[in-house]
Amino acid sequence: AFVGNPAENNRVVYLGGFGGYIIAGFDHNIVNKAGEDFEVILMKSSAPEPAVVYVMPDLNGDAKPNETWYELKGSQFSNSKRNYWVRYYRATSTADNITWLDSEGSRGELKSGYLTASTASWWWSETKTDSITFYGTRLPDSYENTGTASAQFWTVPTGKFAWGYAENNSGTDYDADNGSKKLDISNAVDVNGN
């Protein structure tokens, strides 16, 4: 995810696995008009990594993200898991990876795809405890292996994430000219999907 306007700023933020997020505030209201209301610019050269987008009205006017968040429903809404969580555990040494447990009892570890020895340095600097938990919606797996056991070929099937997700460089709401996803506030739903 870019921070700011990518035409003016080349800084990139890697959001990582489940729970990575950026909160963006605005000095004006975004009006919910017919059709798309705002866009999220993504890295044009990146692989599709569909991400859920949440919005929050500032009803109390304090300009802080302290009210109810609403998920923007996308094309995989009915295939997603609500009230999902992942708990990450601090690596016990600089040579180890961060491990995780999810709300379904699955376990694993964060592994770097950037040729670093471990993911221990990825730990959240503001987190002083040995674990941190993120809650949200889990999308279906993006990639599918269309190859064989000896010759794997992982790809995101065309049309799987047709609309409604950030960091997804395909679909009906993707604007290839500026590399953005055009999103509609009318798709906002509460934690119960209403």
Model regions: which residues?
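A domain-level signal for the mature, folded cores of soluble proteins
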Residues: 1-51, 59, 68-194
